[in-house]
From Swiss-Prot:
Protein location: Cellular thylakoid membrane
Keyword Membrane (UniProt): yes
Similarity annotation: Belongs to the complex I subunit 4 family.
Record-given protein name: NAD(P)H-quinone oxidoreductase chain 4 2
Stretches that traverse the bilayer: 9-29, 51-71, 106-126, 130-150, 152-172, 184-204, 227-247, 258-278, 290-310, 326-346, 347-367, 399-419, 432-452, 479-499
Length: 535
């Protein structure tokens, strides 16, 4: 029997299944000799498990890179690395995975950030078997969300990553971890019901009965039905993005999470909402998107302004960065709603950029907390001289977050601004108001971020902190993690085509689809609802 060629190899299935299956072998890792109740025993056991988990994550990343090199062509808009295996033919259910420009960059981001998150989890010694089992299971589930091309399978993957996050928060979180974990699961699980109901409605509408996303995208849905589906999906994905006022779970979750969980929440979890909006709301329901596009833009502006002002008022370091993340996600909504190629491309780049910047900032927040044992900014101060490496890295990542030219955030936000300013789908007054308000949010960002740096590293010296023996500078592992994140942040800022070339064909195809729908009614978006109603 001949072996399959490299092009026929199930790359994506392997990348999804491999970490999940490997996690099942963690209980079989031999325990070290000694008394299980001692700290030395816990450290030895944790060391064995963490090396195993890191090996699995690194090899999975290498497998993904091999598949990307062998079978992915960025110039194509069609699905690539496609695999379809019949599962339940009676209802058209199959294991269907594939990647295009919308998913491949986020799959690569997931593998990269998760590998670094496992390395960031090095200090974890409490229940290491369960901790790394959940990390690897979440790894497979998150890649699955971006790779699957079956609606029911998408829902299952969406749910798969909820359970690990809940347990990681409730067991390894801070003082209010149970409250934060419960709030997270209530928000996300209840919102997931909208995905299930809307997905079933799409699958069973008309012929054929199918959960395949390609089939669903080609069905002719009545406009009223599209609007209902769009609203249901918007609620579900708005919770995950998150969109005001569905955002309140995020500051609580970040407030209690550990550093590696922070990295996955900020780096990957929020991007699932933006990806799903592009894939389903725009790609499958283009007529409805013309109605909702102005709504997305308004919500994006509210996200930017509200979260920036709220972040400015926060005195807890984790919550301040959490609200900063919410503010940055507002640009994703504006870009998606702009109906321009550069705006849609900017929204995609903003997700990738924030995935890197958010992961780096939250990792540094965790590193700072491990040394100072406080998150209250009033209790910090004067630690910059004691921790020059952490101060330098924190400053660099904060500058990236405030969109300093030469870093990825600047390019992404600039593209969204240009897309919103140049679109012909909205009236000039509307565009000017949106651009002005978004610019106000951009101005607020350096105010609260630079103020945060001043409070942590400068200002009146807190003797209890600066004289504490645990107040040591960054170790090589921590410097390596931040270097791995900063290099692509700066690389994208200097040469954005490095990343935009991976997805531009796909985002341009989305905009072309929307423009086709818009030209068929010969109107701006603001006029579209009236014309549709007249029909």
């Amino acid at each position: 029997m001949a072996l399959p060629s490299l092009h026929e190899f199930p790359w994506l299935t392997t990348v999804i299944v491999y970490p999940v299956v490997a996690a099942l072998f963690i209980p079989l890792i031999p325990a070290p000799a000694g008394d299980p109740t001692t700290r030395v025993y816990a450290q030895k056991l944790a060391e064995r498990v963490r090396w195993f988990a890191l090996f699995i994550a690194v090899t999975d990343l290498l497998i993904l890179l091999a598949g990307f090199y062998v079978g992915y062509d960025p110039s194509q808009t069609s699905l690539q690395l496609l695999e379809r295996y019949t599962w339940v033919p009676q209802v058209g259910l199959s294991w269907s995975v594939g990647a295009d420009g919308l998913s491949m960059p986020l799959i690569l981001l997931t593998a990269f950030v998760t590998t670094l998150a496992i390395l960031a989890a090095w200090p974890v010694t409490l229940k290491p078997r369960l901790f790394y089992f959940l990390m690897l299971a979440m790894y497979g589930g998150q890649i699955g969300v971006f790779a699957v091309q079956d609606m029911l399978l998408f829902f299952l993957m969406w749910e798969l990553e909820l359970i690990p996050v809940y347990l990681l928060l409730s067991i390894w979180g801070g003082y209010n971890r149970l409250y934060a974990a419960t709030k997270f699961i209530l928000y996300t699980a209840l919102s997931s019901l909208f995905i299930l109901v809307a997905g079933l409605a799409m699958a069973f509408y008309g012929d054929p009965i199918s959960f395949d996303m390609t089939d669903l995208a080609h069905k002719a849905y009545p406009l009223s039905f599209q609007l209902l589906l769009y609203g249901a999906f918007l609620i579900a994905y708005g919770v995950k993005l998150p969109v005001f006022p569905l955002h309140t779970w995020l500051p609580d979750a970040h407030g209690e999470a550990t550093a590696p969980v922070h990295m996955l929440l900020a780096g990957i979890l929020l991007k699932m909402g933006g990806y799903a909006l592009m894939r389903m709301n725009v790609g499958m329901l283009p007529d409805a998107h013309l109605y909702f596009a102005p709504v997305l833009i308004v919500l994006g502006v509210v996200n930017i302004i509200f979260a920036a002002l709220t972040s400015f008022a926060q005195r807890n370091l984790k919550r301040k960065i959490a609200y900063s993340s919410i503010s940055h996600m507002g640009f994703v909504l504006i870009g998606i709603g702009s109906l321009t190629e550069i705006g849609m491309s900017g929204a995609m780049l903003q997700m990738i950029s924030h995935g890197l910047i958010g992961a780096s900032l939250f990792f540094l927040v965790g590193a700072t907390y491990d040394r100072t044992h406080t998150l209250e900014l009033e209790e910090m101060g004067g630690v910059g001289l004691k921790m020059p490496k952490i101060f330098s890295m924190f400053t660099a990542c904060s500058l990236a977050s405030l969109a300093l030219p030469g870093m990825s955030g600047f390019v992404a936000e600039l593209m969204v601004f240009i897309g919103m300013a140049t679109t012909d789908a909205y009236s000039l007054p509307f565009r000017l108001v949106v651009v002005f308000l978004a610019a106000v949010g951009v101005i607020l960002t350096p105010i609260y971020l630079l103020s945060m740096l001043r409070q942590i590293f400068f200002g009146p010296e807190n003797k209890e902190l600066t004289e504490h023996e645990e107040l040591v500078d960054a170790e090589p592992r921590e410097v390596f993690i931040i270097a791995c994140l900063l290099i692509p942040i700066i690389g994208i800022g200097l040469y954005p085509k490095l990343v935009t070339s991976l997805y531009d064909q796909s985002t341009n195809a989305l905009v072309a689809l929307l423009r086709q729908e818009l030209s068929s009614i010969g109107a701006t978006v603001a006029q579209a609802p009236a014309l549709y109603s007249a029909d």
